[in-house]
Structure formats: structure tokens, C-alpha cells
């Protein structure tokens, strides 16, 4: 059993233990429905965290069954995969929108760093213990038991340390994206030269 209250690697200047907090002290279930003022152009697909307006809805009235999904909110997607055995949470960092009522949406109720929590709640190593005890298996996916989820505990750093960690991983993702683009460009150049430099 790991009783550590601090990570093995930390940024300089941070020495305090991380605080044990119930997730119900950080998030509350949001049941806020779309009042009809948000159109299908603001529909967010949880699987890819993108706006997707080509969803078929029978009527504009049906859009009122959708939940509002604001920046900082998290939603549970119960599909299991090799990477996420019990499903996963995703955080909205793309803009205010709406999601289907099939997703459980939670809203932060304390000050927190958006970037830090994006990485924390999508970290299978951290969330596996939480989700294994707060989900139940159904056909092809897991259902979240809200009360069990909100009763689970999580070690949380100060807001200052959250910001430092969130910024660090956000910067790494930015660098990865830049290098992936360069790699794709080099692959295209190679393909072009392979076609043109041989007779």
C-alpha cells in the first residue's frame, strides 16, 4: 500500500504534502439542461472533445434534453478500452457547449487549475482505483455511480502547484504536436522524392 502524500518528482519550492480531498468537495453533479438557446453547432462529442454539428436530432425540442457542458466541466464516458478499463473522464477545454444526456456531467465547485485537472482525471493510473469502485459494468460499457464517485478521495496539491504541473504538461503536449506536424511534413517530402528521384 502506497501511503505517499507527495509525488516522487516536484518542482522547486513545493514541499507541502498533498491534501486528501473527497471528489465531492471538488465537483458536483450538474443537471443543467440546455434551455434551447444553444444550437447543434455547439454539440460536443465526448470521445474526441470536438464540436460536431452533424448529429441527427429529431427536433430542436430534443436539444433541450442535452446537458450544458461548460469549460472546466468533466463528463464520464463509460466505454472500456485497452487504455481505460473502467471508462474515463474528459474535461471540457474547448469552449462552452452541450452534450447528450447519456453522459454524466460534473462541474467544479472550488478554484482549481483547468490544465492540472485535465491531466489528473484522464490519468488511468490515478483514476483506475476511483473508477473501479464507482462504476458498474453493463453491456459494452461501464455506468458511473455518482454517489460512489463523489465519495472517493484524491490527493490534491495547492492551486500554485496545480498551475505549475498543468503548465508543464500542456507545454509538453504543445511540443509533441509541433514535432508530429514536422514528422508528417517530412514523410510527405520523403514520399514525393521517392516518386521523383527514381526512374
Predicted feature descriptions by range:
Residues 1-199:
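Feature detects amphipathic, helix-rich regulatory segments
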Amino acid at each position: 500500500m502506497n501511503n505517499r502524500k507527495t509525488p516522487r518528482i516536484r518542482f522547486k519550492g513545493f514541499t507541502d504534502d498533498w491534501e486528501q480531498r473527497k471528489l465531492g468537495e471538488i465537483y458536483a453533479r450538474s443537471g443543467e439542461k440546455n434551455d434551447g438557446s444553444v444550437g447543434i453547432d455547439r454539440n460536443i462529442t465526448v470521445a474526441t472533445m470536438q464540436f460536431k454539428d452533424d448529429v441527427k436530432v429529431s427536433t430542436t425540442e430534443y436539444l433541450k434534453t442535452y446537458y450544458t457542458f461548460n469549460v472546466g466541466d468533466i463528463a464520464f464516458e463509460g466505454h472500456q478500452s485497452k487504455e481505460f478499463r473502467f471508462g474515463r473522464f474528459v474535461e471540457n477545454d474547448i469552449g462552452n457547449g452541450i452534450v447528450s444526456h447519456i453522459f454524466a456531467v460534473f462541474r467544479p465547485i472550488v478554484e482549481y487549475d483547468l490544465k492540472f485537472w485535465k491531466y489528473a482525471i484522464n490519468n488511468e493510473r490515478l483514476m483506475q482505483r476511483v473508477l473501479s469502485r464507482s462504476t458498474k459494468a453493463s453491456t459494452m460499457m461501464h455506468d458511473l455511480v455518482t454517489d460512489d464517485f463523489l465519495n472517493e478521495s484524491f490527493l490534491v496539491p495547492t492551486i500554485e502547484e496545480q498551475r505549475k504541473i498543468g503548465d508543464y504538461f500542456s507545454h509538453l503536449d504543445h511540443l509533441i504536436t509541433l514535432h508530429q506536424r514536422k514528422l508528417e511534413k517530412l514523410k510527405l517530402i520523403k514520399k514525393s522524392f521517392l516518386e521523383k528521384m527514381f526512374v
